[in-house]
Amino acid sequence: MASFGTSFMLTLISIVFMSIAPPVTSNRLTDTEIKHLCSKTNNLENCYKLLKSDPRTTNVDARGLAEVSVDLACKKANKIHSLINSFVNKSHDSRLKNIYKSCSSNYNDAIHDLKVIKNYLKSGAFKNIPVQVKDASDEIKQCKTVFGGATSDGAHIKKRNQEVEFLISIVEVTSSNLSKN
């Protein structure tokens, strides 16, 4: 009778621990799946390297990968936004200052869009993400267009815009994968 009680207790404990295990382990993305997602961007190699360089992608599910991609895009956009704001304050050329102000506003809006995406990821509102991705992308493209008229680009804003556009394309790919599930 004692062994039945012990067996029952061990079984019960096992069931409890298995139900507590995070769902990430059962839906972990393989390297092949990450490469397949990255193949939908304009640079598979850079996308894959970038995602795999983040330690959070070691054992991640599709939602986690999308969250990592949003974090990477947000981090880069915030860094560039700060740089642009510093040039707004330093510039003595009124035309260039206005271009920097316009781009700063675009980056502010793009960062807001990325934060909204992050909230949608947390809440599971995946179908709402594509609109925010497009909005964020459009904001960066607008900065690129406005900055295209600048005669000098000492801060390499055009190149930095391309980096953020690429990161947003990764967000688009990783999040669009979620809305199919």
Q: Where do the PLM segments sit?
A:
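Terminal membrane/secretory targeting segments in land-plant proteins
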Residues: 1-29
